[in-house]
Amino acid sequence: METRALSVNLREVKKNGAAKLRRLGQVPAVVYHKGEATVAISVEEISLNKLVHSSESHMIDLQYPDGKSVRSFIKDVQFDPVTDRVIHADFQLFSTDEVVEMEVPIHLEGECPGVKIGGGKIQINVHTLPLKGKPEAMPEHFTIDVSALELGQTLHIRDLQAIAPEGVQILGDADTSVVSVVAPRKEAETAAEGATAEA
């Protein structure tokens, strides 16, 4: 997994401080690690957006003004419900020998027969997968081959563990639907109407 650098500044936690930072183009955030005190920081909104909206996951070197640098990853992000702007972020520190949990984006590859021959369309039900493993084993994205997926078929989390990178476990409910091939809406509605008429 690629590592990206992100400049950060320490911040004081005080009344209305977060709102003031946002007006200045900064996003309030925290840095934490098990057994250590949580550190309040701020990051440039533009730089953070590039990481948050990337199609890949990254390890992040948080770089402080005094030259200190620590390795982390984005654990959580909060968005404004109206503007969809990032309003807060959590960064989790890690060491290379510890197991971490993080969300990784899904990438699809292959020509889907359920689409090409069956006339269906691919429906992505979740866009990220929660993974658990050591940092060096974590992929930038999780690739799913859909070249054997027929119309009406669905891949669940339980189907994907076999293709996970060595040493990486997929978390979550095994029955969670990840990607499906569904009939176009008109066909689905016609089929439903036909079934109703027969009934």
Swiss-Prot record:
InterPro entries: Rbsml_bL25/Gln-tRNA_synth_N, Ribosomal_bL25/Gln-tRNA_synth, Ribosomal_bL25_b-dom, Ribosomal_bL25_C, Ribosomal_bL25_long, Ribosomal_L25_dom, Ribosomal_uL5_bac-type. It comes from the Bacteria. This is one of the proteins that binds to the 5S RNA in the ribosome where it forms part of the central protuberance. One of its GO terms (cellular component) is cytosolic large ribosomal subunit. Part of the 50S ribosomal subunit; part of the 5S rRNA/L5/L18/L25 subcomplex. Contacts the 5S rRNA. Binds to the 5S rRNA independently of L5 and L18. Keywords: Ribonucleoprotein, Ribosomal protein, RNA-binding, rRNA-binding. Belongs to the bacterial ribosomal protein bL25 family. CTC subfamily. This is Large ribosomal subunit protein bL25. It holds the Pfam family Ribosomal_TL5_C. Disulfide bonds: none annotated. CDD domains: Ribosomal_L25_TL5_CTC (cd00495). GO terms for biological process: translation. One of its GO terms (molecular function) is 5S rRNA binding.
